[in-house]
Amino acid sequence: MCVYIVAGLGNPGPSYDKTRHNVGQMVLDILSGGARFRRHKTNNFYLSLGDILLVKPDAYMNLSGPVIASLMKFHSVSDLLVLHDDIDLPLGTLRFKQGGGTAGHRGLRSISDCLGSDYARLRVGIGRPENNQSIEDFVLSNFSPVQTDIISRTIQLAAEAVLHLRDNGFVGVKQFIAQTKLPSRT
């Protein structure tokens, strides 16, 4: 039986796979251990890890809310953890947040429009654009080689944090992050 839904935000298609905006789905790829996600009739790809259902919405970021909401309804699950990029956090930073605003993140706005704002988020810091690059171009671009090293380690830690849902729920995720030395702090 599914107890938690963990949704990794991102855009569909191989051209977006390595972009900053897709770090939420990158975390799910680590958690899957190479297993293939299956398509669900609610326009999601999913993989079950026992009581945790990993979900990749098969929709663009700003349309992810309806597909996540329909899967939650289908499985009668009320506990949601959303994994997403955050430009307001330095590269390599992780933060857990329960509820609150969207900070202009269109994926979160779509989810909040469908479900309200009382869901958990694991924010993955991607930093801010430099040299007057637009935010849209920045989040849809790939990481540099140095940034890739940092974000790869961060994504691995985010995946470990998600596994703490099994034993300790959202408190376990929050405690793991608080006790973990993150790559950006080295």
UniProtKB/Swiss-Prot annotation:
GO CC, one annotated term: cytoplasm
Reaction(s) the record says it catalyses: an N-acyl-L-alpha-aminoacyl-tRNA + H2O = an N-acyl-L-amino acid + a tRNA + H(+)
CDD domains found in the cross-reference section: PTH
GO molecular function: peptidyl-tRNA hydrolase activity; tRNA binding
Site (Discriminates between blocked and unblocked aminoacyl-tRNA): 11
InterPro entries: Pept_tRNA_hydro, Pept_tRNA_hydro_CS, Pept_tRNA_hydro_sf
Site location (Stabilizes the basic form of H active site to accept a proton): 85
Keywords: Cytoplasm, Hydrolase, RNA-binding, tRNA-binding
GO process terms (BP): protein quality control for misfolded or incompletely synthesized proteins; rescue of stalled ribosome
UniProt-annotated binding residues for tRNA: 16, 60, 62
Domain of life: Bacteria
E.C. designation(s): 3.1.1.29
Cellular localization per UniProt: Cytoplasm
Active site feature: 21
Enzyme class label: hydrolase
Family to which this protein belongs: Belongs to the PTH family.
Subunit organization: Monomer.
Role: Hydrolyzes ribosome-free peptidyl-tRNAs (with 1 or more amino acids incorporated), which drop off the ribosome during protein synthesis, or as a result of ribosome stalling. Catalyzes the release of premature peptidyl moieties from peptidyl-tRNA molecules trapped in stalled 50S ribosomal subunits, and thus maintains levels of free tRNAs and 50S ribosomes.
Protein name (Swiss-Prot/TrEMBL): Peptidyl-tRNA hydrolase
Phylogenetic lineage: Bacteria, Bacillati, Actinomycetota, Actinomycetes, Micrococcales
